[in-house]
């Protein structure tokens, strides 16, 4: 509890511990980051988000998915409540499945500048077809750029 109070006092976190306002459309501005206290270590962080929803931009029908977010942090890390509110903001947003995962990845790169990140969307079937889009990013000119290429080429093998 002391650590959270320190982070709130340092101005890093604003949403955690407060009342919740749910945005009605895509809202990247709700994302918050905090300082990684283990910057000397390379390690994975995984978020499993089983209740993601968005709207088909053509039909307006809801799409449902589990979103997996895996990243190797550097200086900044995404705060989980802000991530939850951000993902919730897609609920009334029209975007194709492939767009959703790429938008999420780009917004998280902008927020955190991670060493490596990958996003997988496991969308439930509509019309008898499931779509599982995957995207990734590794920081250019580092071993993480090579990791991104390898994981992309080895994906689903």
From Swiss-Prot:
| One Pfam family matching this protein | QueF
Cellular localization per UniProt: Cytoplasm
Example of a GO biological process term: queuosine biosynthetic process
Catalytic residues in the record = 56 (thioimide intermediate), 63 (proton donor)
Extract the InterPro entries matched here: GTP-CH-I_C/QueF (IPR043133), NADPH_dep_7-cyano-7-deazaG_red (IPR050084), QueF (IPR029500), QueF_type1 (IPR016856)
Instruction: Identify the enzyme class.
Output: oxidoreductase
- Write the signal peptide boundaries: none
Q: Which UniProt keywords apply?
A: Cytoplasm, NADP, Oxidoreductase, Queuosine biosynthesis
Q: Does the keyword Cytoplasm apply?
A: yes
Q: Name one GO molecular function term.
A: preQ1 synthase activity
Pathway entry? tRNA modification; tRNA-queuosine biosynthesis
Q: What is its EC number?
A: 1.7.1.13
UniProt keyword annotation of Protein biosynthesis present? no
- Which positions are annotated as binding substrate? 78-80, 97-98
The record's Gene Ontology cellular component field reads:
cytoplasm
Q: What is its main location?
A: cytoplasm
Catalytic activities: 7-aminomethyl-7-carbaguanine + 2 NADP(+) = 7-cyano-7-deazaguanine + 2 NADPH + 3 H(+)
Gene3D superfamilies listed in its UniProt record: 3.30.1130.10
What protein family does this chain belong to? Belongs to the GTP cyclohydrolase I family. QueF type 1 subfamily.
The cross-references to PANTHER family, in alphabetical order and at most eight, read: NADPH-DEPENDENT 7-CYANO-7-DEAZAGUANINE REDUCTASE (PTHR34354:SF1)
Q: What does this protein do?
A: Catalyzes the NADPH-dependent reduction of 7-cyano-7-deazaguanine (preQ0) to 7-aminomethyl-7-deazaguanine (preQ1).
Please report the name of this protein according to its UniProt entry: NADPH-dependent 7-cyano-7-deazaguanine reductase
